[in-house]
């Protein structure tokens, strides 16, 4: 099956004409509500900062490794392709892809782990929840409101990037543990995002596009960095088969072109599988509206069982060979130290933060959240610069 042009809008797609609106009502003008969400995200300060935030490799390790920004753009491209093939709203899928990592602190998941540990006594830190906080509170550009005043559908999708957060009674589910992330609780006090339901279809598209981009592009970056080699991928169910296809078609092809051909074919296989499986599930569930999608007992947008196994094998390979590689771990251990140092410094001496970040006389919990917001907004480079400003030694992270 080839994923080709757009099909007519499905009845179960989210429709900008029938959006649940914005917290602060606005006239939408010539652009659709979801298109305006995309544009606001692209023009935000947090989006620009993604350029100098780590994906896996710290920003200065090489010009061709992915950053949070290039990863985000790749997720958006995949999300638009899937949404177009399914007859969903491309603008909403793109908006959710563009926003999904806005809350990531510097130094990738190492920075998040360090910040979460620092915030253990103050409600913790979660980058998905922080993305919601960025677009609802921390961006301060508009005259009439804080945040970006995005539509309900976009905010819902950001909050539920990994699925429902509570059961119908409000009890936290899964990774949320016993307590919901602070940013989710804070926003729920002013707007009900129906945390107990699944997200809308476009949000599910953005989430699975994130998985596809992670899997394929981390394989690509790992190969470029020399953390592992093509021959080591032969045993992976899907990747090995695609690699064999490429080698059979072009036996003398140079390695760089082989890698690119394998990666582009992997994306195509993943996307085509998602489209087929989603169409099958939609027919079986007889969904007629985005409400039906949200009320379904399982995600509608998903991999088939076979592809889910193949995708899990890719992740299973990447963990020991890339994410826990000794070189990566050494750098990320040092990066966590930078975050811990900065948090302790600003908690003890909040006057060292810029004037508009200071909260004189604030209670510890509020001050800690302020410090976490400040650090989470830093790029890798700015975090290292700030560390060098206040500490005698700062790691080079190379």
Swiss-Prot record:
Organismal lineage: Bacteria, Pseudomonadati, Pseudomonadota, Alphaproteobacteria, Hyphomicrobiales
Record's keyword annotation contains Hydrolase: yes
Key words, A-Z: Hydrolase
UniProt similarity note: Belongs to the dGTPase family. Type 2 subfamily.
Record organism: Azorhizobium caulinodans (strain ATCC 43989 / DSM 5975 / JCM 20966 / LMG 6465 / NBRC 14845 / NCIMB 13405 / ORS 571)
Keyword rRNA-binding on entry: no
Molecular functions per Gene Ontology: dGTPase activity
Example GO biological process: dGTP catabolic process
Record domain HD: where: 68-215
Name under which the protein is recorded: Deoxyguanosinetriphosphate triphosphohydrolase-like protein
């Amino acid at each position: 099956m080839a994923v080709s042009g757009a099909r007519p809008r499905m009845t179960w797609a989210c429709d900008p004409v029938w959006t649940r609106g914005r917290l602060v009502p606005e006239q939408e003008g010539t652009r659709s509500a979801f298109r305006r969400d995309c544009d606001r995200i692209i023009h935000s300060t947090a989006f620009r900062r993604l350029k100098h935030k780590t994906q896996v490799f710290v920003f200065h390790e090489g010009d061709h490794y992915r950053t949070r920004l290039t990863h985000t753009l790749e997720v958006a491209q995949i999300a638009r392709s899937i949404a177009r093939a399914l007859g969903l709203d491309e603008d909403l899928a793109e908006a959710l892809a563009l926003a999904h990592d806005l809350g990531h602190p510097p130094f990738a998941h190492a920075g998040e782990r360090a910040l979460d540990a620092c915030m253990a006594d103050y409600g913790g830190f979660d980058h998905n929840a922080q993305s919601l906080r960025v677009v609802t509170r921390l961006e301060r550009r508009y005259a009439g409101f804080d945040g970006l005043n995005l539509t309900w559908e976009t905010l819902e999708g950001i909050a539920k990037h990994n699925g429902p957060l509570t059961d119908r009674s409000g009890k936290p589910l899964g990774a949320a543990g016993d307590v919901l992330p602070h940013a989710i609780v804070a926003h729920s006090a002013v707007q009900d995002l129906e945390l107990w339901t699944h997200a809308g279809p476009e949000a599910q598209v953005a989430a699975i596009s994130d998985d596809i981009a992670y899997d394929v592009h981390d394989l690509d970056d790992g190969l470029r960095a020399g953390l592992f080699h093509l021959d080591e991928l032969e045993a992976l169910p899907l990747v090995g088969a695609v690699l064999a296809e490429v080698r059979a078609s072009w036996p003398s092809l140079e390695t760089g072109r082989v890698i690119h051909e394998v990666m582009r074919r992997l994306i195509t296989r993943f996307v085509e599988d998602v489209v087929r499986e989603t169409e099958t599930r939609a027919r079986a569930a007889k969904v007629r509206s985005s409400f039906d999608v949200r009320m379904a007992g399982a995600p509608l947008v998903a991999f088939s069982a076979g592809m889910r196994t193949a995708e899990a094998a890719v992740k299973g390979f990447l963990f020991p060979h890339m994410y826990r590689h000794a070189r990566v771990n050494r750098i990320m251990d040092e990066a966590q130290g930078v975050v811990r140092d900065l948090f302790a410094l600003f908690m003890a001496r909040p006057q060292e933060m810029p004037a508009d970040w200071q909260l004189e006389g604030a209670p510890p919990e509020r001050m800690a959240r302020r410090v976490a917001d400040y650090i989470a907004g830093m790029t890798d480079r700015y975090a290292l610069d700030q560390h060098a400003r206040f500490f005698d030694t700062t790691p080079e992270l190379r």
